[in-house]
């Protein structure tokens, strides 16, 4: 699957530094755009809201967070609020991290997303 060379959108100036890499990767995916993100600030878990209208992208993202193929610390949930009519999802850490553990887990997640979006998996994921 083709990942764009650069993100489709510019992140807001107040984006948490720890969120920039994962948001940029998600924004490079087809039919996908981040909406909000937060690194947690020691009060809650790291999370990113994103819109996606491509089932193949969602399937690969699901594989990237699947505990069989990752550290198992991440999940993707459907955002079922009234704010968005459809296609909004919530990528979040399952628990809070100290800063160094969070950075390590986010880096592993980013690497894992890029791994599963490699062209070698196109036949496995295209609908």
Model-based region annotation:
Residues 1-127:
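Structured alpha/beta or helical-core interaction and ligand-binding surfaces enriched in interleaved
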